[in-house]
Curated annotation (Swiss-Prot):
Protein name, entry field: Isocitrate dehydrogenase kinase/phosphatase
Annotated organism of origin: Acidovorax sp. (strain JS42)
Stretches assigned to coiled coil: none
Compartment list: Cytoplasm
The gene coding this protein: aceK
GO CC field: cytoplasm
Active site per the UniProt annotation: D381
GO molecular function annotations of the record: [isocitrate dehydrogenase (NADP+)] kinase activity; AMP binding; ATP binding; phosphoprotein phosphatase activity; protein serine/threonine kinase activity
GO biological process: glucose metabolic process; glyoxylate cycle; tricarboxylic acid cycle
Length: 609
């Protein structure tokens, strides 16, 4: 119950201190995001990567700062609960007319849950449900930039309109030939529109801020004609001579889904009203959850908040039980899922059998490495949670026993909230998008019969994509470590993505070697490794026996990716990275690129990133 009167004098001051903490966080977050434009203009690629990594840490730093301030100035942990009721009410008042209220709610939750006992983690004390609407938020500042701009071209001046749209981005670097690039865009658009009649509402809406990631800047918008909307994005890159060019045009929901994939690094976007950007992006990608859009924009904590709300909603309206995930069980991670929910839940086992030589802390470090690194569309993002409570009745007994056997330190079953309901509390877990494990996908091809063209084509595509995934990770200085098929998954769009991170390494930390010649006949026929192997030694020519036991798989692999078995491939990329050269891995097929220019890039065969 909320109090009828706000009579605690310190309640407003605490609420104001928390809001000050959030405002400081978002001011710094937005400033760092806005600087991405200058880094792009000056081709500061290493600075861009460094900023993308460092910005991930901003949120937790600001939360800790705020907690320290509340403890020091207000002894917040000792306050009675009726004061915390009032603090939340004052905070709601401070969110009225705020431009980022949903982010401010999440910040309040993060601070409060570090101070209060878990029994108070419900809607009386934190924002389990949103308290302030994010619809139709607008800035009243006369100098504020609108969320998006609308343009009203005709067929006759479409070219001039495209030029004007790009010029409004105000990039402080010359284009190679903007009229030429605009011509390519118009030609592609006219091919999509065909002979369709342009209706009276024909317009182009474009988000005001560019989306920056690595070496690319992306202009995102949609074409509206009658009742139809066509999402699009224009990738802007540096050409070989340093001037800018439009590299391609992406059309439709699927292209935009690839651009905003959960397997890519987060964008840097200067947003005053992030909810308005998310609302616009959802009109382009209606199947993409808002949680994933906030995460793609670098607002990962908001993504976690929305994901958890979606998860609780799904639990309320489903009845199936959590189970051990199908597939080959891992030696490091215990994986379970809810069949009706498109995600998997992964927790680290307490002990690892040989030959695994790692620790819980090292595994967590690997997952953090992936979180902070450029995932190039080939490594699944993860949501990390602690002390997550699930209804006991939704867990199968088999799953409970599996967790108790392999990760007893990670599970507690109790009525911690005191409401009479037993809960399964998992101490620490990761959540990832569910994909079909690649080994299962290949087995389905075998079961269908490779004499059938569709099965053979699916196998060829999967094996080709597997090699492409490895090569894209190589381009980003990542060696996957355990390259078995079961550690890769295939998405609904047919992309192959890596998701097992416990053996991942920087490519530059690996020592790529050839297998030495046998010393004697016994060495030659031995099935064992007889030569000395260091902790970071990798022997690419030994990959074949582990990966290519099936003749059809081997044929497809050797046709497209035989170089992965050659030490020279790996060593050359290691040396290239050590020399400071960053390859480009873009989120669209190389066939989509305008052929008038080709900036230096790393394109895998059949690239579909």
């Amino acid at each position: 119950m909320f109090p009828e009167r706000l009579d605690a004098p310190q309640a407003y001051d605490i609420a104001k201190a928390m809001m000050d903490g959030f405002n400081r966080h978002y001011r710094l977050f937005r400033a760092e995001s806005a600087r991405a434009k200058h880094r792009f203009e000056t081709a500061d690629w290493h600075g861009q990567q460094r900023a993308q990594r460092e910005r991930i840490e901003f949120y937790d730093l600001r939360v800790r700062e705020c907690v320290r301030r509340l403890d020091k100035e207000f002894n917040a942990g000792a306050l009675p609960m009726d004061v915390w009721h009032q603090i939340k009410l004052h905070y709601i008042g401070l969110m009225v007319n705020h431009l980022q209220p949903e982010l401010a709610e999440t910040f309040f939750n993060s601070v409060t849950t570090k101070i209060l006992h878990r029994t108070h983690f419900h809607n009386d004390f934190i924002f389990v449900r949103p308290a302030v609407s994010t619809e139709y938020i607008e800035s009243d500042d006369p100098g504020a930039r609108p969320t998006y701009r609308a343009y009203y071209p005709s067929r006759d001046n479409l070219h001039e309109t495209v030029v004007r749209i790009v010029e409004h981005c105000a990039l402080q670097r010359d284009f190679e030939n903007l009229p030429r690039d605009a011509g390519h865009v118009v030609q592609a658009l006219q091919q999509r529109l065909g002979a369709v009649k342009l209706r009276t509402n024909f317009q182009v809406q474009v988000l005001s801020s560019l989306f920056f990631r690595n070496k690319g800047a992306y202009l995102v918008g949609k074409v509206i004609n009658g009742y139809n909307e066509l999402p699009f994005a224009l990738p802007i890159l540096h050409g070989e001579d340093g001037r800018l060019l439009i590299d391609a045009v992406l059309f439709g929901e699927n292209d935009l889904q690839m651009l905003f994939s959960f397997a890519r690094a987060y964008f840097m976007v200067d947003m005053e009203i992030p909810s308005a950007y998310v609302q616009f992006l959802r009109s382009l990608m209606p199947r993409k959850p808002r949680a994933e859009l906030y995460t793609a924009l670098g607002l990962a904590k908001q993504g976690k908040t929305l994901f958890y709300r979606d998860f609780l909603h799904h639990l309320r309206y489903s009845t199936d039980k959590f189970r051990i995930a199908p597939g080959i069980k891992g030696m490091v991670m215990l994986v379970f899922d809810l069949p009706s929910f498109p995600y998997v839940f992964k927790l680290i086992k307490d002990q690892f059998p040989a030959p695994k030589d790692t620790t819980r802390e090292q595994v967590q470090g690997k997952y953090l490495l992936v979180k902070q690194h450029d995932r190039v569309g080939r490594m699944a993002d993860t949501l990390e949670y602690s002390l997550v409570a699930f209804p006991r009745e939704r867990f199968s007994d088999e799953l409970i026993e599996e967790i108790r056997r392999h990760a007893p330190s990670q599970i507690e079953i109790s009525d911690r909230d005191g409401d009479g309901r037993q809960e399964v509390i998992i101490a620490h877990l990761y959540i990832e998008r569910r994909m079909i494990p690649l080994n299962i996908h290949l087995q389905e091809c075998f079961d269908t019969g490779l004499d059938k063209p569709e099965a053979r084509s699916a196998l060829e595509h999967a094996v080709t994509e597997y090699g492409n995934a490895i090569k894209d990770m190589v381009a980003a200085n990542i060696f996957p470590g355990d390259m078995l098929w079961k550690n890769f998954g295939i998405t609904r769009n047919g992309k192959v993505v890596f998701y097992d991170y416990d053996e991942i390494e920087y490519l530059t930390d690996c020592n790529f070697r050839r297998v030495p010649p046998p010393r004697c006949e016994e060495d030659e026929v031995s099935g064992e490794v007889w030569w000395p192997v260091g902790p970071h030694d990798v022997f690419p020519e030994t990959f074949g026996p582990f990966l290519l036991g099936n003749d059809s798989v081997r044929e497809a692999f050797m046709r497209h990716h035989a170089d992965l078995l050659d030490v020279e491939f790996w060593q050359s990329h290691k040396e290239r990275i050590q020399a400071g050269h960053l390859y480009d891995v873009f989120p669209y097929d190389s066939a989509r690129r305008f052929r008038c220019a080709s900036p230096s890039s790393f394109q895998t065969q059949g690239d579909s990133t």
